Amino acid sequence: MKTIICSAILGLCFSVTGFSQSDVYTTSGGEVIFSFADVSQTGSNANTNLRFAPVINLQTFVHKDFSNSFGLFSGIAVRNVGYRMDGYKDPSDNLTYKKAFRSYNVGIPIGFKIGQMDKIYFYGGYEIELGFLYKEKTYEDGDKVDKITGWFSSRQNVWQSSLMAGVQLPYGANIKFKYYLTEFHNRDYTNSSGIKPYADLNSQVFYFSLSFMLFRNTEIYIYE
């Protein structure tokens, strides 16, 4: 997986240097994420709630438009991804809790664009992400009873891949759907008590997002 990341970065660098400055442009801005998850534990579907994450979600894209109707893009992004779950059964005490899981990820996307590059276009692509900060909160009867935080935690699958599709609207507005192909948790993780808290937990995160590309190169992003 690390080889894939390095290859993607090198490919992006070579593609950028291969075009003149006028052929390539950048866009940057923020993303507001509304995430869900398809979750099951011990084979039974679990109840999950909408997770609203307005921060910290930043992204910068490098674009190459081959015509006014087709282009490619790549870039780098930092985002806050996760889900909320009711009825998590803790294998250590067989009690049921409410859980909130999240991860701060840095990602490298690669994709294509079809439509009118100066107005409205549709896009799709693939993204590889590295989860660098994991957080987990446990609630009982509405009160927080535990919190876990870890850098590059083995509780989650640190390397995550996803597919995305969306539409770019005028004035920098953007609507996107993303589905994570990689399970959120590392099922093989074993804690200090010898228990695997996620062994029976299957979780696939997906989200809708609303983002605004605030800048095109160094100027305010507005189509005339």
Q: Predicted regions span which residues?
A:
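Bacterial N-terminal signal peptides
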Residues: 6-15
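Boundary at the C-terminal end of the N-terminal hydrophobic targeting segment
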Residues: 18-20, 83
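Short glycine/proline- and aromatic-enriched beta-strand/turn motifs that initiate or cap beta-hairpins
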Residues: 20-63, 211-224
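Residues that define the transmembrane beta-barrel architecture of outer-membrane proteins
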Residues: 22-26, 50-56, 100-106, 157-163, ...
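Residues on the lipid-exposed face of transmembrane beta-strands in outer-membrane beta-barrel proteins
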Residues: 32-34, 54-64, 76-78, 106-116, ...
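Flexible, solvent-exposed loop segments that connect beta-strands
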Residues: 40-48, 83-101, 136-155, 187-199, ...
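Glycine- and aromatic-enriched membrane insertion/assembly motifs of diderm outer-membrane
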Residues: 47-94
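Predominantly the C-terminal beta-signal and adjacent terminal strand-loop region
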Residues: 151-224
